[in-house]
């Protein structure tokens, strides 16, 4: 999964993460049931805070695009074409 952050962009960093993951789900780059990086792992990979990544994952979960599985991590949900 590739996420590119523009630190001084128009959107907040967590929104950039949400939008990029959302686009990868819609385009099929990320498939249903595919595991996402851990919150800490993604934060370290893209150089943002854990809190920022957590907020992005929470937003994606609210939108029904990802789900959290206890003690296992986050997984992509089946995209039904509606957001």
State where each predicted segment sits:
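Aromatic side chains
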Residues: 14, 57, 74-75
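Extreme N-terminal segment that seeds HTH/winged-HTH DNA-binding domains in transcriptional regulators
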Residues: 1-35, 41
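N-terminal helix-turn-helix
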Residues: 36-67
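Generic alpha-helical secondary structure signal
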Residues: 15-18, 61, 79
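HTH-adjacent hinge/linker in prokaryotic transcriptional regulators
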Residues: 63-83
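Poly-acidic low-complexity segments
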Residues: 6, 49, 78-80
């Amino acid at each position: 999964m590739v996420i590119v952050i523009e630190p001084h962009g128009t959107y907040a960093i967590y929104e950039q993460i949400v939008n990029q993951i959302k686009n990868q789900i819609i385009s099929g780059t990320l498939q249903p049931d595919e595991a996402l990086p851990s919150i800490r792992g993604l934060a370290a990979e893209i150089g943002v805070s854990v809190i920022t990544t957590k907020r992005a994952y929470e937003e994606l979960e609210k939108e029904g695009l990802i789900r959290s599985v206890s003690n296992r991590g986050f997984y992509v949900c089946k995209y039904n074409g509606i957001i």
